[in-house]
């Protein structure tokens, strides 16, 4: 993935990565291929392997824990998005599937809407 981050070993901290989200819909409009999203997941795996104690997500809703759970959340969201993208006939179906998979997410609805339209080929980005 092309998203740099800083690893601070003395603090066991990851900061500065815009590809880590906390408790909000993930922005996928900039990753329009399965390969790009797979590279993103690989970077998240790389980050998780460091076993950080502190993770400051680049995007998060209020009260999001600043720990490795944000890495796990983002990875699982992307994997769910990939599965639902393949199973959905259009963006409306994809949006509904993601809202069903993540019913508690209230932040980032516009990110989901645009990402679904772009990745289903209904909107140019």
Go through each PLM region and give its residues.
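Catalytic core of the metallo-beta-lactamase
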Residues: 1-38, 42-45
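Short N-terminal signal/transit or membrane-insertion segments
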Residues: 1-5, 84, 121-125
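Divalent-metal (often Zn2+) His-rich catalytic cores of metallo-beta-lactamase-fold enzymes
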Residues: 7, 13, 38-93, 97
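Generic preference for flexible, low-structure residues
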Residues: 22, 29-31, 71, 101, ...
């Amino acid at each position: 993935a092309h998203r740099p981050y800083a690893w601070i070993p003395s603090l066991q901290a990851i900061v500065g990565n815009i590809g880590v989200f906390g408790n909000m819909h993930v922005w996928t409009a900039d990753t329009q291929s399965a390969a790009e999203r797979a590279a993103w997941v690989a970077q998240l795996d790389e980050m998780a392997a460091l076993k950080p104690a502190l993770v400051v997500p680049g995007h998060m809703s209020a009260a999001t824990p600043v720990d490795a759970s944000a890495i796990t959340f983002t990875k699982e969201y992307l994997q769910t998005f990939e599965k639902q993208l393949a199973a959905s006939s259009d963006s409306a179906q994809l949006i509904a599937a993601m809202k069903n998979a993540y019913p508690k997410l209230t932040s980032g609805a516009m990110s989901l809407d645009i990402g679904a339209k772009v990745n289903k080929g209904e909107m140019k980005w």
